């Protein structure tokens, strides 16, 4: 695998999952990613994270491209535009992921796991900060005979072993962050039982080969970073910097989701201009003093992570 160019230039990325129409939370994160890269004279790559192709029909990928372009959040390569570091759709990258996966296997770090999600929850195992169960190591030391017996009844998923080690990094928005791989994360999935590669491996491989130097994403993924930094190290790849932006909540304090039709861009485009939406989001995230209409370009010169809140952002009543 050849990594993309890292010649001092900042390369950010949009990495949406096309499981539905974009909502305001997706758009806010995309705006911050775009502004952070462009304020440093950088570029943006669009990667479509459709690992689970059945849940991510191509029509949604096409629509999110239209929505981003309509807002003025134009990317420099990727998506249907193409470029030198494709494929840009994760559903087309299984062979690329396999090569890197085999490197981890060769290090003796990958093992089969036969545990079901129901079994893990029933075991009352502790949870990570993003809600996932911290794996208790049930299948970590199975013998070859035990593995062969379990395979007769069930196809395994595959996990990577983690050490009892702290990973510390400086987040561009949230500041210093530390997680213990074993205590706070646990051995984590690399590949599902149906053969689909897991998010943690796919994003590491893709960001490296696309030359991404800066990852901006929602704070719900902050706890994934230690796991990904561990994979960068194991695979000998250059890790990017990270900035995790606060999530956007509705006026009642609930996290927005693609099921919230009122906050989807499909509906918002009928009520507001692109400049009005950008201006309102910029106001909510502290980038301008009033919710006045503006373009993304007009925000570049004044952008600073110091202006962005550290806590989740609750939409003021009546803003949208």
Model regions and ranges:
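Non-catalytic terminal extensions that flank enzyme cores
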Residues: 1-21, 39, 44, 71, ...
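N-terminal Rossmann-like or analogous alpha/beta NTP/dinucleotide-binding catalytic cores
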Residues: 2-124, 128, 219-220, 224-237, ...
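Noncatalytic linker/hinge segments flanking ATPase motor cores
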Residues: 23, 86-91, 152-156, 200-205, ...
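Sparse recognition of residues in long alpha-helices and their boundaries
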Residues: 49, 80, 244, 268-269
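Alpha-helix initiation and N-capping motif
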Residues: 61, 94, 117-120, 132, ...
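Alpha-helix boundary recognition
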Residues: 102-106, 208, 269, 282
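Active-site cores that bind ATP or allylic diphosphates and position pyrophosphate for catalysis
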Residues: 118-257, 264-268, 317-320
């Amino acid at each position: 695998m050849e990594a993309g160019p890292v010649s001092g230039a900042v390369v950010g990325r949009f990495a949406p999952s096309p499981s539905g129409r974009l909502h305001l939370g997706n758009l806010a994160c995309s705006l911050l990613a775009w502004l952070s890269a462009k304020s440093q004279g950088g570029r943006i790559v669009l990667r479509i994270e459709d690992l689970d192709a059945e849940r991510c029909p191509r029509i949604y990928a096409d629509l999110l491209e239209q929505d981003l372009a309509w807002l003025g959040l134009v990317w420099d390569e990727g998506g249907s535009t193409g470029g030198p570091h494709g494929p840009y759709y994760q559903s087309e990258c299984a062979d690329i992921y396999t090569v890197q996966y085999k490197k981890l296997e060769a290090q003796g770090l990958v093992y089969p796991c036969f545990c079901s999600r129901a079994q893990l929850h029933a075991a009352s195992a502790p949870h990570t900060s993003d809600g996932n169960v911290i794996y208790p190591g049930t299948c970590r030391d199975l013998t070859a005979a035990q593995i062969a017996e379990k395979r007769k009844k069930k196809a395994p998923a595959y996990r990577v072993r983690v050490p009892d080690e702290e990973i510390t990094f400086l987040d561009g928005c949230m500041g210093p962050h530390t997680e213990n791989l074993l205590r706070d994360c646990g051995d984590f999935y690399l590949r599902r039982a149906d053969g689909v590669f897991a998010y943690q491996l796919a994003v590491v491989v893709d960001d490296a080969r696309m030359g991404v130097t800066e990852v901006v994403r929602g704070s719900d993924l902050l706890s994934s970073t230690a796991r990904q930094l561990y994979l960068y190290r194991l695979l000998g790849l250059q890790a990017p910097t990270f900035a995790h932006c606060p999530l956007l909540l509705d006026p009642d304090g609930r996290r927005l989701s693609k099921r919230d039709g009122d906050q989807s861009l499909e509906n918002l485009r009928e009520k507001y201009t692109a400049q009005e939406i950008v201006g309102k989001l910029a106001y909510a995230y502290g980038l301008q003093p009033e919710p006045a209409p503006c373009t993304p370009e007009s925000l570049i010169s004044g952008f600073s992570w110091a202006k962005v809140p550290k806590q989740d952002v609750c939409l003021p009543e009546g803003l949208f």
